[in-house]
């Protein structure tokens, strides 16, 4: 999660999930981004049962689970997620946690939107651990710091900060990396994920890099 956009949240979540699957873990991905980038990448855009049903209380959990070609299961996104928030805050703050807690998976990875919306706060409330991907630019690092601060209100802990699209030749990027190192220490994954056209190619192909 990162409150800034364009940091590689969906790509990181998908690659991490497939890696867990390769190690024999039973993995569920949950797309809580109303834009549905993960759902689109996995070819499940026309799903009639999706994560919004958790928030509306209209669906039994098992009816939302879908198998994918990437060896992980998925609960798809829906544009209706834009409606989650406002006066629903108190009622829905734990609803995602309550629903996911019933699933029998080794690992559940939730992909979120940017920002700190009420929807994203339900994701924070559901998380045991939080991974913060970030580009090495000022706005992305600022967004990473916002999420780290916001997570202090919830039981989940920041497990890792993951630099993405890293260009080791960038002076500004190296300065941002030094700032992240000072702030997060050992939980900062170094050297991070390098900038590469392979990531865009994978998105176009509708698959992970693994």
Describe each PLM feature range:
Residues 1-210:
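P-loop NTP-binding core
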């Amino acid at each position: 999660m990162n409150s800034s956009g364009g940091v590689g949240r969906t790509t990181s979540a998908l690659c991490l999930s497939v890696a867990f699957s390769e190690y024999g873990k039973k993995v569920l991905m949950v797309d809580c981004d109303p834009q549905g980038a993960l759902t689109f990448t996995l070819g499940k855009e026309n799903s009639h049962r999706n994560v919004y049903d958790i928030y509306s209380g209209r669906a039994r959990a098992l009816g939302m689970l879908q198998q994918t070609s990437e060896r992980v299961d998925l609960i798809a996104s829906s544009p209706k997620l834009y409606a989650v928030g406002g006066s629903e805050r108190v009622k829905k703050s734990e609803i995602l946690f309550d629903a996911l807690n019933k699933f029998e998976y080794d690992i559940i990875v939730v992909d979120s939107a940017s920002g700190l919306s009420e929807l994203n706060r339900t994701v924070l409330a559901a998380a045991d651990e939080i991974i913060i991907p970030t580009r090495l630019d000022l706005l992305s690092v600022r967004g990473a710091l916002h999420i780290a601060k916001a997570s202090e209100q919830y039981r989940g802990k920041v497990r890792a900060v993951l630099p993405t699209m890293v260009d080791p030749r960038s002076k500004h990027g190296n300065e941002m990396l030094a700032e992240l190192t000072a702030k997060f220490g050992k939980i900062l994954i170094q050297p991070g994920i390098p900038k590469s056209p392979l990531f865009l190619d994978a998105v176009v192909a509708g698959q992970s890099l693994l």
